[in-house]
Amino acid sequence: MHSRLNSRAWRGAMVAAAIATGAALAVAGRAVAQQQNFDNVEIDTVKVRDNVYMLVGAGGNTTVFTGSDGIMVVDTQFAPLSTKILSAIRAISDGPIRYIVNTHVHGDHIGGNESISKAGHFRAGGNVVGDLGAAATATAAIIAHENVLKRLSADPPAGQPQVPFAAWPTETYITKKREFLFNGEAVQIIHEPDAHTDGDSLVFFRKADVLATGDLFTTVMYPFIDAANGGTIDGYINALNAIMDITVASNVNEGGTMVIPGHGRLSDEQDVTEYRNMATIVRDRIKEYVKRGMTLEQVKAKKPTLDFDPRYGSDSGIWTTSMFVETIYKQMVAANPPTKPTQSKNQPKSSGK
């Protein structure tokens, strides 16, 4: 894809993606949002295809899907940007916001859940009436994998704020895929386990042929493997392969399935292919070094990411190239522990003297 938005937006997205690591990531967006100034952040709107749009601000990219049934929002960025996000949505459509889908647990993707859900309302079935029906339809439904709810409902790390109950998913799924009809289009929400986190979802709009990936694919950094929240490099590569199974190229050129990344520019299958190849090559290099018995320092000295650093590397911030390499190294060591040398049958035993 040659389509580009301004570099300010992408730099802001990259910073937002690297807010925190470990267990604190689920609530970090809220804590950092209290310290950052979002007054100067602008929300850029990109029409992707048909009635699907991408909103770019200071957190993860937001997807907006509109139609006769209402509006579906995929990821909600940071809480302080909620008013701006809502204004951008209203510039697209004044229809009711029915659904929010969270691709994973991180604060730069769920921060606006509470405000945006309260601005919408869910259309419940006819068997939900009275006070219960009113409660059930008072806000937009928030959909995510069950593991997202488990992470959000757990006690937060010491010193971190609890994500408000109103921002938690109201509907979860535990199967590989959840699919339903909305705005006359089949929408598929697909779980990719143990990848960026343990609760990642892809959201595929079949008729429009648009896929929102969350942080299972970005264009601005190395894969963010949140090991503390269940992420693994092998699962991440599996997820990229799953994305490629869904997407279709247009005559091996630009076009075909449009891919909305968690951070970065609008993409297509070729972009995902390049990213998958990079992740696989780096993983395999480090795996080979581990098999040779190299230490972490020796692996870093080999610079296994050297040819990809100009595009994805970073020496500063929370998610650096060094941290990417170290995370893969630790997971490869855990998967391939060194074996104790076996004693030859013909080797004489020590007399102990």
Predicted region positions:
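Active-site metal-binding motif and surrounding structural segment of the metallo-beta-lactamase
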Residues: 68-72, 80-140
